């Protein structure tokens, strides 16, 4: 609507008006994501304002676990530490006690033997070997339904260890 007020002309076409509202909403949505500490993780894999493929193609049970992970709802130290105002660098993984317990660490790096066993069972070697943030982003942006199912099983079983 800012465009409407700046240019001071009436918009009679409903589709133009709807597109303007959508564009403004998406701008605000992106701004909120990038300016929030919680949004830092979300912005790794969520680039567009659209429904995610996994929501349409996975079973409800699998969707729940993927969504919990993507919305930082697994009670990882990075999140629980935020609740108690613990400095970010002190939110250490409870399983390996080596580094910050964030989503990247949980999914690809944690050296806890049980997590490693699950990772070896459910995640392809490509993601496990020499993990990096590009692979992490790729894993969370995949379109492969079978891999997403295996990822959801890994998340569910690994979360039970927390």
Ranges and model annotations:
Residues 3-6, 11, 24, 32-162:
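Family-specific functional microsites
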């Amino acid at each position: 609507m800012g465009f409407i007020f700046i240019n001071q002309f009436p918009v009679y076409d409903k589709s133009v008006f709807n597109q303007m509202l959508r564009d403004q909403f998406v701008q605000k949505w992106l701004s909120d994501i990038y300016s929030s500490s919680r949004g830092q993780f979300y912005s790794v894999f969520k680039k567009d304002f659209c429904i995610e493929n996994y929501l349409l193609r996975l079973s409800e049970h699998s969707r729940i676990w993927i969504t919990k992970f993507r919305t930082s709802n697994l009670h990882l130290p990075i999140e629980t530490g935020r609740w108690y105002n613990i400095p970010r660098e002190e939110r250490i993984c409870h399983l390996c006690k080596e580094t910050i317990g964030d989503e990247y660490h949980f999914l690809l790096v944690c050296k806890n033997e049980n997590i490693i066993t699950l990772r070896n069972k459910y995640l392809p070697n490509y993601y496990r070997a020499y993990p990096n943030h590009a692979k992490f982003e790729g894993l969370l942006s995949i379109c492969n339904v079978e891999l997403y199912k295996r990822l959801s099983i890994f998340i569910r079983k690994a979360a039970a260890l927390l």
